[in-house]
Amino acid sequence: MAGTQDAPLEEILWRSPSHVQMMGGFLHSNNILFYFAESPFFDATSNNASLAIQANYNETFRHFVETREAFEGRLKTMQGLEFVVSYDPLQAAAQSNGQFAHEPSNIWVIHKQTRRKRPGLEDEVEVLSTFFVVGDCIYMAPSVASVVGNRILSAVTSLTNLMKTAASLPNFTPAHGHTYMPPVSKSTDTAQPSAQPSKENTPMPDADSTKASLVGGAQSTNAGSVFQHTRTLAESFSLLTQYGDEFMDENPLVGEPGSFIMSRNNEGAASKQPPVGTTRPGTVPVRAGTPQVKVDTPGKTPDKGLTPGPDENKLRKKKGKSGV
């Protein structure tokens, strides 16, 4: 019982079949309040407890506990805390002729309330709590504050989970700006016209054949991607081998990032020049000029600055001897 008292009253359920057996085997209008008095929801300082104790020790109060109408009638003459039946399923189901209009629901409603006497006016009654008796089980109805608080807590919890999920969705790109979903590329393939529908019903595919087709399609896709990667790698190596030593500039850049310098490539330029006497394939040959023949005129002195050859020296010696 101590553990039950520590728990919130709105979260517990109380029932006692043994007390029901002691009270005649079923609950009715005259014993429902006494059955409720055995539950942890009952307050021992209420007017119900004091009136029951007085009826046990005073014969003049005995008739107050025989019927519920007499018991509640006596409570109305007192002020303070009390428990009264707010809804009686037997009275609600019975008609004026004493017959039942429908089967009783066996759900009782009990109010915990305070009564204050006012001279010349009706009593001021304030309802503090509401309890339900379903069969032999007693429940406490939750308050409006508890219901609203639970609803708000559920909404706040859902919003918190939403914010955690949405925090990872925003994405910023210079092209699209702030987006909350990844951009979907539009397909450029034109939709193929659908075939003419058949008048007969299409047979449903078997599960095994569908699974086998899915597995075969996945394997063919993987094989195609592996072949494409291998082909791309081979082409890359071929381009590297063929054009790996060529540069876009005559003077390639050397150095580290941030401190590049232009290198001199004289050796490369000299090596690219073709040797003398060789012609590049595809070039037009140049026409060679006619060699000039030198003709010496007798009696004409050679030009200054020219060194006489051996034949000229012999002619001069012969002329000198003939003159002597």
Curated annotation (Swiss-Prot):
GO molecular function, one term: transcription coregulator activity
Keywords assigned by UniProt, alphabetized: Activator, Nucleus, Transcription, Transcription regulation
One GO location term (cellular component): mediator complex
Ranges of Polar residues composition bias in the record: 185-201
Keyword presence, Transcription: yes
Subunit relationships: Component of the Mediator complex.
PANTHER family xref list: MED-6-RELATED (PTHR13104)
Listed name of the protein: Mediator of RNA polymerase II transcription subunit 6
Upper taxonomic lineage: Eukaryota, Fungi, Dikarya, Ascomycota, Pezizomycotina
Name of the encoding gene: med6
